[in-house]
A protein has these predicted regions:
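Short, solvent-exposed mixed-charge patches
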Residues: 268-270
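Solvent-exposed adhesion/ligand-recognition segments of exported proteins
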Residues: 2-214
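Intrinsic disorder/low-complexity segments enriched in small, polar and charged residues
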Residues: 264-266
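Extracellular calcium-associated, cysteine-rich motifs in secreted modular proteins
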Residues: 210-262
């Protein structure tokens, strides 16, 4: 089955995160229990939080993320929403084989079984193009055939995305919460509400080994204005460091303190 091809919009600085809770103003929250996350993790808002319980994270934790990250996520979400549908789908997608294109569900999608993607992408799936609709996957597996890149798969969801006992491929942009329970997830989980991960191995897209443009990272024993590009801050005092998160200037700490800085390398997605 083929569908109208499209160019995937840029995620901007939001694409630097494997997991992002971009909730407006208050309530950004990422919770991970008995899982793993490979990539950066971010949460937005005045009460931003990232809670780990037996969940190692390979990457930076940023809470709160900058306003630009949230704005880039919202822009990308709107851009995907505006992409015309190529083929409308119904059913669970069990046993389906899909070439690159834009595939749409007008309402909610409940998915099970195995979906095979052939070619090199991109694949764009839109759930709830009629205005409302959640993505629910149970024992749902996505596999690549023909050497396709999991990072060329995007799932735009009008409301929440919930995956249970699934081996999922693709980046989710959700209009509400994302919940991942047991299984594997290869892509970025980006939501306008909370992201809850339980017993799931999340591998960001790509697994972040460096930092992209606009990605905030915490300084680690860097000399102020030295090799790590950190401003002098009050050592080990994030709230009063002279950083990019709006803290008040503190006394220069030994070897630079715990300020933050913006990396200047190229973004992993353009």
């Amino acid at each position: 089955m083929a569908a109208l091809a499209a160019t995937a919009p840029s995620l901007g600085t939001a694409g630097n995160f494997a997991v992002l809770s971009a909730a407006p103003l208050h309530g950004g929250a990422v919770t991970c229990t008995d899982g793993t996350i490979t990539g950066n993790v971010g949460s937005s808002g005045l009460r931003a939080s990232v809670v780990q319980t037996s969940c190692p994270i390979t990457g930076s934790i940023v809470a709160p993320v900058s306003a630009k990250v949230v704005a880039d996520f919202n822009s990308a979400y709107a851009a995907y929403a505006a992409i015309p549908c190529g083929t409308f789908l119904t059913g669970t997608l069990a046993g389906a084989t899909l070439a690159p294109g834009v595939y749409c569900f007008t309402a909610a999608a409940t998915l099970t079984g195995t979906l095979t993607l052939t070619g090199s992408g991109p694949w764009i799936f839109k759930i709830g193009t009629g205005g409302t609709g959640a993505l629910t996957g149970t024992n749902f597996n996505v596999v690549m055939a023909g050497g396709g890149n999991p990072c060329n798969v995007t799932w735009w969801v009008a409301q929440a995305a919930t995956l249970t006992d699934s081996n999922f491929i693709g980046t989710i942009l959700a209009g509400a919460a994302i919940t991942l329970t047991r299984g594997t997830f290869h892509g970025d989980a980006l939501a306008k509400a909370a992201v809850t991960i339980t017993g799931t191995a999340v591998t960001g897209c790509p697994a972040t080994k460096g930092h992209g443009e606009g990605d905030e990272v915490h300084c680690n024993q860097g000399v102020g204005n030295g090799p790590e590009g950190c401003d002098p801050g009050n050592s080990n005092n994030h709230n009063t460091s002279n950083d990019e998160l709006g803290g008040t200037p503190g006394d220069p700490g030994r070897q630079g303190g715990n300020g933050t800085h913006h990396a200047t390398t190229a973004s992993k997605r353009k």
